[in-house]
Design a protein with these regions (language model features):
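Internal "kinase-insert"/substrate-recognition segments embedded within catalytic cores
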Residues: 220-226, 240-241, 261-266, 278-377
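Bacterial Sec-dependent N-terminal signal peptides
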Residues: 13-44
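A conserved helix-loop-beta module that forms one wall/lid of the active-site cleft
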Residues: 242-276
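Sec-dependent signal peptide recognition
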Residues: 2-10
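Middle-to-C-terminal accessory/interaction subdomains
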Residues: 168-170, 196, 208, 212, ...
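Conserved NTP-binding catalytic cores of kinases and kinase-like/nucleotidyltransferase enzymes
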Residues: 150-248, 252
Length: 537
């Protein structure tokens, strides 16, 4: 996907007084800004647009008269109000007593003149939103509307070619093999680079997924690179999604995470992978979870800690809390004894506070409640079987700070793709995160948190706030499937598992379309169930 917004600056306007936009009316003579003529040309030609970027002093737009008719334009924003109206309404435009346009009750000092031709008019207000129309309000009363043209649906998703130096498959999760990676994206689906190549090391990754025929991989480049306009780093992952026959559950969960606003959401894109010349299907290429300034941005050297909750207990330092939560040090992976003692005491104190008779007065000093609420929403909405503080959960603890659910990970057996909940309910029904803790039903952190009326009130308020954004996820899923084009068909030619049970599928269908339809059906039903139940708490 082409990068949609490089910078999100909501306001590019010079304010010199509380009642007007722009400079003093005494010396300001309205005129068309530099670059506006190309916007006029694009509007007259009926062009849509595919890319937009905003800086403090200009707007740059890639218009599209069609797939093969690129037309770019850049315009100065001097004396123009511009805002991102995602999730909000544009400001009201009106005319003041002097006959000048006002935006949101503030005068622009630009006269309204309906006699002006579009070619003579002056822009004074611009609104935009991701994936929506771009609107330019001009002084003759017209609004130039440019439809969003989504070129992500054209062409093929990127191809990733992995070649090991020994030309053999990858059999180990511990030992890296050396080799080369080549990424080809001639259709510019997700970045402007057509081809990237580098030397690398590669090994297997994952727990249960490593035991499946289609293997997931961990890649470490010899030099840092900013792949697919993600973070600049050496370490990357290829998720196989073997048991997720929709191929988009992890992608969908990260989109929900992005909308909820977690401190970090791992970026992911779908790709097709070739290993030593053999086609291996559709994978999800993503940022590896790690501490860095562009990923988990904490200061380990200063005493901050990244923890993982994981029953596998496969890190160097692991322990179970007094209430049965399986903790591990993720970074630092070899903590000092002082850090170990501090961490164990912190969780002991937190759980003691949480199970205290007057817990509502004390537990909040240990946790960042907002992140715990968002974690509950995404894990409960997806009914992620691993999300009940049992596996693949990540928390940060800043020195002298509060415990934060920093990011989420691993959703391939969520959203109707699990058959072992053990609650006897359909996958879109029943509480999971709220009631089913890591140490059994009615015994976990969230079970106690929901005994606090204030916590419940905050959950309900947050749910009402994000519910409209969650309602549009099905359309996002359908778009993501369209972006992949014919790649899923090739994937299931390589892996002939449609119509066959793969652990832990709740439902087995006979086509890719039916797999996507099941994901959409389950998500829609779960969202409706959640909305009813959360508001009734």
């Amino acid at each position: 996907m082409k990068q949609f917004f490089k910078t999100l600056l909501l306001l590019a306007v010079l304010m010199t007084g509380c009642d007007q936009i722009g400079p003093s009316a005494d010396n300001y003579k309205p005129k068309q800004p530099e670059g506006f003529s190309r916007f006029q040309t694009a509007y007259a030609a009926g062009y849509g647009y595919s890319e937009l970027s905003v800086s403090s002093d200009s707007i740059r737009v890639a218009f599209d008269g069609g797939p093969n008719q690129p037309f770019t334009a850049a315009m100065s924003l001097e004396h123009i109000l511009i805002e991102d109206v995602s999730g909000a309404s544009p400001k009201i435009t009106a005319v003041d007593s002097q006959g000048c346009w006002m935006v949101g009750g503030v005068s622009t000092k630009i006269p309204k003149d309906e006699k002006l031709l579009d070619s003579q008019a002056i822009p004074f207000y611009i609104t935009y939103a991701e994936g929506a129309d771009l609107r330019v309000y001009v002084s003759n009363g017209n609004v130039f509307v440019y439809k969003f043209y989504d070129n992500r649906f054209e062409g093929e998703i990127p191809k990733v070619y992995l070649t090991t130096d020994d030309r053999q498959d990858i059999y180990s999760k511990e030992e890296y093999k050396t080799g080369k990676i080549v990424i080809k994206d001639p259709d510019h689906k997700f970045w402007k680079t057509e081809e990237f190549s580098a030397t690398m090391r590669i090994r297997g990754r994952g727990n249960s997924t490593w035991g499946m025929p289609k293997k997931p991989y961990k890649i470490k480049l010899d030099e840092k690179a900013r792949l697919f306009d993600m973070s600049s780093d050496k370490e990357w992952c290829l998720l196989a999604n073997y048991c997720d026959k929709s191929l988009v559950r992890n992608l969908t969960a990260m989109e929900i995470s992005r909308r909820l606003g977690f401190s970090w959401t791992p970026k992911m894109v779908p790709v097709e992978v070739y290993l030593n010349g053999r086609y291996d299907g559709v994978y999800t290429f993503c940022e590896h979870k790690k501490v860095s300034s562009e990923r988990v941005d904490i200061d380990v050297d200063a005493g901050d800690i990244l923890f993982e909750i994981e029953q596998q207990q496969d890190e160097i330092v692991c322990w179970w809390t007094d209430h049965g939560c399986p903790m591990m040090f993720s970074d630092p992976d070899e903590p000092t004894q002082e850090q170990i003692d501090f961490a164990k005491q912190f969780f002991r104190d937190f759980e003691t506070a949480l199970w205290n008779k007057e817990f509502t007065k004390v537990y909040s000093q240990y946790i960042d409640k907002a992140s715990f609420i968002d974690y509950f929403i995404i894990q409960e909405l997806t009914k992620n079987v691993d999300g009940n503080l049992r596996k693949s959960s990540y928390l940060t603890l800043p020195k002298d700070g509060k415990l934060e659910m920093y990011f989420v990970w691993d959703f391939d057996i969520s959203m109707g793709n699990c058959d072992y909940y053990g609650d006897g309910l359909k996958p879109w029904e029943g509480w999971w995160i709220k009631d089913q803790g890591c140490n059994g039903r009615y015994h976990g952190w969230y079970y106690r948190l929901f005994m606090d009326p204030n916590f419940v009130s905050e959950v309900k308020a947050r749910w009402k706030e994000v519910y409209p954004q969650l309602q549009t996820i099905p359309q996002w899923i359908e778009d993501e499937v369209k972006i992949m084009g014919a790649a899923p068909e090739r994937n299931f030619e390589r892996w002939n598992i449609l119509g066959i049970y793969v652990w832990p599928n709740y439902k087995v269908t006979g086509s890719y379309k039916a797999e996507v339809d099941w994901l959409l059906e389950n998500y829609t039903k779960r969202l409706a169930w959640m909305n009813t139940q959360v508001l009734a708490l």
